[in-house]
Amino acid sequence: CWVETAFKDVTAGIKLRTRGFAPRLSDSEVITMEMVGEVLGHDGDEAIWAYFRRHWATWFPGLGDRSTFVRQAANLWRVKQLLHERLVVDVGARTADGHIIDGFPIAVCKLARAVRSQVLKAEAGYGYCAAKREYYYGLKAHLLIDLRGVAVGVTVTAANVDERDAAYDVLSAIEGLVLGDKGYIRPRFKADCEALGIDLQTPVRRNMKESRPRWWLMLLQRVRKRIETVISQLEQRFNLAKTRTRDVWHLTNQVTRKLLAHTMGVWLNLRLGREPLDLDGLLVA
């Protein structure tokens, strides 16, 4: 399968383990299970393990106890990043005609419990989500996609980090047209984007003069809805609107896994000539 072949390619020359025996369940099997589990809506490590233990144990005879599976999966976070990069390159998402950038919240706990929460205490912060018109405590994901909906990159910061400051991490490897919302308006940020070869297009605020033609503004508004769809899928199907992880290691694995699974779904749709973001239809195709 693709995972097995790509896994061998991206890990060529890399020694994943310095000692001990090879695991009974192969690393490529673990990643395959994670991706399938995520697409089916089983977003947590335990839920994915339980699903395959209950329904597909004969297909994965090496599947052992839950803690072993969770630890092995978390240790493969870097490999999953390399696999995601492989998909991005394969579909030409970095060199696409245009990209869209936006952020969304990842709650660590309910706002009322924030003072007592010890989960990701050094990384979390208080933030405001304009789309939901609510304050929250946790993290913020800054997502970049191409115009088809392929997730090119993501970076996660504390909720109180300005999205313009975080955007540099995901914009550094692309050029051309980038669509953003009003939150990305800042003269210095605009100038930095131009220096990187990026044409940043955003709506204007009420006190700003608009010189672009109306048809262009309507087109930008319509195209920007693509990232709203992707974020909605990540929040609902992949449950990325909150996290139950207690450390950066497992958080990194969780975010990477969900992004990889989503991108794999889009990749499959593109290969089948289907609507890229129709993940529901992919499951019954």
Task: Cite the ranges covered by each PLM segment.
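Short alpha-helical elements
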Residues: 1-285
